[in-house]
Amino acid sequence: MRNVKRTIRVTTSDVSAPLAPPPQWIEPELCKLVTRIPAGEGWANEIKFDGFRMHARIVKGAAELLTRNGLDWTAKYPDIAAAIGSVKCRQAYLDGELCAMLPDGTTSFAALQGHGDVPAELMYSRSI
């Protein structure tokens, strides 16, 4: 058996090449209710945060916030959009949860809906 080493080369021209814009919309992966827990390897779980399912589409330093139904909520959460837009990348499409984090570390949907006196609003991203 031969030992084969694979190498990926990246040149400056590769990195600075024009990119196709990220998609306008990606259908979110939603949880599915089941009567039995799946068995076997390859299954994972995640914390259920109490918030709004949100996509963030980043292009040239600006982020758009999109609900799970595709509504643009950028104007509702401009600080979150600005923070996500400051991520050092050329472009990205994030899928996550917009949450109001309480001082005890839990999330509160009611506090998020009030939006005025929320101790901390943040977006957890589950996939890119």
What are these regions (language model features)?
Residues 1-128:
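Catalytic cores of nucleic-acid ligases and guanylyltransferases
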